């Protein structure tokens, strides 16, 4: 059985390549829809749960850091909220996508299909949930005395695609290695916890001492998170953050794709 092409170039011309690419997108859509249904089919509130978790986390962090620790940051609730949702998209996608190949061994052995859609469907699934959070961000921004700008109509798709590309590279790399090193599933949980604190999610980069800022700038998620924050709180296209984010995304795609292409031929044997 064959659901998509992994050897299209030698089997046909551009028409076949286009057809198989279309099938891959259709399969990605079907997997994304299936994951969304399975995740919330037995719940009463459904998608509300995907919004409740980051909102609760933001509320707890606000009380702890603003009211107790007394962090001196203006409009700290916006600083938190505009970073928590895109970070949740990243963290949840990486965590769930890590065993995407390893947990689908039977499917990989029996069916030929574009295997990359397995981890990528997790990204798009969580991307839908991130999209549902955008009205909440807009509402909080408006209630804070600021007006959402038409710039958002450009900035949201641009930053969304950049973060999507970055995550695609990361999950292809990690999920490919997880087939051969199953301890990676446990290690990635610890890595993501540490990654959270070295990413300017609970604090803006502006308050970081200069001697430490250069190290945080080496974090691929730093320009992405700062970009979202600048877009939502300042209503400007974060050009200064966009170019580093694009470079990180391109590097991630290159490394992730290379790792996937070099290892996918051994998936069936390893599983």
Which residues are covered by each model-predicted region?
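Hydrophobic transmembrane alpha-helices and immediately adjacent juxtamembrane helices
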Residues: 1-271
């Amino acid at each position: 059985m064959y659901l998509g092409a992994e050897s299209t170039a030698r089997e046909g011309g551009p028409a076949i390549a286009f057809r198989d690419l279309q099938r891959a997108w259709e399969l990605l859509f079907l997997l994304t829809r299936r994951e969304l249904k399975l995740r919330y089919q037995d719940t009463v509130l459904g998608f509300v749960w995907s919004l409740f978790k980051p909102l609760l986390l933001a509320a707890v962090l606000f009380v702890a850091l603003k009211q107790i620790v007394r962090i001196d940051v203006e409009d700290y609730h916006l600083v938190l909220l505009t970073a928590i949702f895109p970070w949740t998209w990243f963290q949840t996608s990486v965590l769930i996508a890590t065993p995407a190949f390893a947990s689908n061994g039977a499917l990989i052995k029996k069916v030929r299909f574009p295997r990359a859609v397995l981890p990528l469907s997790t990204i798009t699934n969580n991307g839908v949930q991130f999209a549902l959070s955008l009205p909440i961000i807009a509402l909080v921004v408006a209630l804070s005395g600021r007006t959402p700008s038409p710039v958002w109509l450009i900035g949201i798709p641009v930053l969304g695609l950049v973060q999507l590309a970055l995550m695609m590279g990361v999950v292809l790399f990690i999920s490919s290695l997880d087939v051969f090193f199953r301890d990676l599933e446990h290690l990635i949980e610890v890595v993501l916890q540490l990654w959270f604190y070295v990413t300017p999610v609970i604090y803006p980069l502006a308050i970081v001492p200069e001697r430490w800022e250069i190290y945080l700038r080496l974090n691929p998620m730093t320009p992405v998170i700062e970009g979202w924050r600048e877009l939502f709180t300042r209503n400007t296209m974060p050009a200064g953050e966009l170019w580093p984010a694009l470079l990180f995304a391109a590097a991630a795609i290159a490394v992730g794709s290379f790792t996937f292409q070099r290892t996918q031929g051994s998936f069936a044997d390893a599983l």
